[in-house]
Design a protein with these regions (language model features):
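Catalytic Walker B motif of ABC-type/P-loop ATPase nucleotide-binding domains
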Residues: 86-90
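Conserved signature/switch motifs of ABC ATPase nucleotide-binding domains
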Residues: 81
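Q-loop/switch helix immediately C-terminal to the Walker
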Residues: 26-38
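Conserved ABC ATPase "signature" region
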Residues: 42-58
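Hydrophobic anchor residue at the start of the ABC signature
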Residues: 75
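Helix N-cap at the start of a conserved alpha-helix in ABC-type nucleotide-binding domains
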Residues: 97-99
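Catalytic "switch" loops of ABC-type ATPases
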Residues: 12-13, 18-23, 122
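Conserved ABC ATPase signature
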Residues: 61-65, 69
Length: 141
């Protein structure tokens, strides 16, 4: 099924929520595979995930992974979806500095000329990823 919001096909939008919204009993690979159309290549997904997750975590149920690992699975799922717009809500929550830099490289690699909308409190993160940055510095009611 498809629908549109102001003429934009909602199937062209991918989102990573602040809460990971993963399927707990599925592996990292299967959580990514489930959003892909057609017959996704399991080995390609594995190779893709290896750039941000250790090999021994890829086939484990995501409910057994750490918070930072779950975050990276959610990110991989959002970036793997073939949408034109990718919305990432606080993608760096729970990540240490080195992991965050690795994830930033991953985002840039997986971007594929698509539009990213990233909500973050980290000005440095926004500067590394953003071509255009909009800063909200007051509460909006």
């Amino acid at each position: 099924d498809s629908g549109s919001i102001s003429g934009i096909d909602i199937k062209s939008i991918s989102c990573m929520f602040q809460e990971n919204r993963l399927i707990p009993d599925l592996s990292a690979i299967d959580n990514v595979r489930i959003v892909l159309r057609g017959k996704p290549n399991r080995q390609e997904i594995r190779n893709n995930l290896l750039s941000i997750l250790p090999d021994d975590s890829l086939d484990m149920p995501v409910n057994s992974l750490s918070g930072g690992m779950k975050r990276r699975v959610a990110l991989a799922r959002a970036l793997s979806y073939p949408g034109k717009l990718i919305i990432l809500d606080e993608p760096f929550t729970g990540l240490d500095k080195n992991t965050k830099l690795n994830v930033i490289d991953y985002i840039l690699k997986m971007r594929n000329n698509r539009t990213l909308l990233i909500a973050t409190h980290g000005t440095d993160d926004a500067n590394l990823l953003g071509a255009e940055i909009i800063k909200l510095d007051k509460n909006i009611n």
